[in-house]
Amino acid sequence: MASTLITNIGELVTNDPEAADDGRGLLGIVEQAALVIDGSTVAWVGRAADAPDADQLVDAGGRAVLPGFVDSHSHLVFAGDRAAEFAARMAGTPYAAGGIRTTVAATRAATDEQLTSHVARLVEEMRRQGTTTVEIKSGYGLTVHDEARSLAVARQFTEETTFLGAHVVPDGDPGEYVDLVTGPMLDAAREHARWIDVFCERGAFDADQARAILDAGAAAGLRGRLHANQLTYGEGVRLAAELGLVAVDHCTYLADEDVAALRDSGTIATLLPGVEFSTRQPYPDARRLLDAGVRVALASDCNPGSCFTSSIPLCIALAVREMGMTPAEAVHAATYRGAQALDRDGQHGIGALVPGRRADLAVLDAPSHVHLAYRPGVPLVRQTWVAGRPL
């Protein structure tokens, strides 16, 4: 298989886990750099002057190169949109339509082909903005058949599929619905999913219901995730820490004991600033979490209701401007920490440009990663590579 040398890289963000020990800082930056790709993996990284020969040569033109973004939280399998709801929210006027239930109805009415085409467009949109790995949830079907087919659609685009039958409590008996989620729905979904998720929030699923659903998922071989503490203080974050979940998402309203639980458990707090941007709600306090020693990831939460953006560069800019993160912390959170939030940061994983990792990368039309926050709204991703191939 042909090897490729990408040289004349002005700034190479490696996310080398050993970088902090040798003085290269959080991002493991190498200046005037090069990297060699062999097949789908990174084979060599270092100074351009020391680069070995390869079969093909690519000149980066002094641009910055960084690991592809890892979007560990999205809801891409849906039909229709809720633009009227967004416009009403921005105008501060009441909106009487059905919210998430509008999306559920449209998704159930769509064909598999329509859903697949829609997800393909969104994934391509993400790729153009540097995202190389995306997690995709179900959650707009809420029947045995529609949850299973939503996951089957998602599986065409990613291995990181998440069963979110516990997205909203339908009309009727909540206990009966939990039984449905943990029984027939889980049985139908498990073959298409790697993860199971619950929206643990006041007005949705409480901590006891979330625990029951996550326990059932674990018994079926699915790893647990959790939406928690988005709308108010609650038990969800502490439940995630108690269960040792790899990540818990939103984390907007946190008591001191929530922060301590995240720190002590090692559970990653995945922050979703696009939601707060799109809903005019308070942003999570990333600075507080980082200073407490909590691991923080960033993701898009791309969905038709609370956050219809697929742009990780926008999320990075918001995290820096509104949540107290440095540009380096935000880039690290959207790459390496995102990989950790999907438990994909191992020797042959993603989220870093070091030998043995998958060659997923973004080439910026800028000399430094700082420009992602410095120039918000500018399409800075010049080219995206996935598994060693340029798109």
UniProtKB/Swiss-Prot annotation:
Cofactor(s) the protein requires to work: Zn(2+); Fe(3+)
Keyword Cytoplasm: yes
Cofactor annotation comment: Binds 1 zinc or iron ion per subunit.
Recorded metabolic or biological pathway in which this protein acts: Amino-acid degradation; L-histidine degradation into L-glutamate; N-formimidoyl-L-glutamate from L-histidine: step 3/3
Residue numbers binding Zn(2+): H73, H75, H227, D301
Catalytic activity: 4-imidazolone-5-propanoate + H2O = N-formimidoyl-L-glutamate
One Gene Ontology term, aspect cellular component: cytoplasm
Residues the record lists as binding N-formimidoyl-L-glutamate: Y140, N303, G305
EC number, UniProt record: 3.5.2.7
Positions that bind Fe(3+): H73, H75, H227, D301
Residues that, per the record, bind 4-imidazolone-5-propanoate: R82, Y140, H167, Q230, S306
Entry function: Catalyzes the hydrolytic cleavage of the carbon-nitrogen bond in imidazolone-5-propanoate to yield N-formimidoyl-L-glutamate. It is the third step in the universal histidine degradation pathway.
Family: Belongs to the metallo-dependent hydrolases superfamily. HutI family.
Identification of the protein by name: Imidazolonepropionase
Organism of provenance: Nocardioides sp. (strain ATCC BAA-499 / JS614)
Phylogenetic lineage: Bacteria, Bacillati, Actinomycetota, Actinomycetes, Propionibacteriales
Name of the gene: hutI
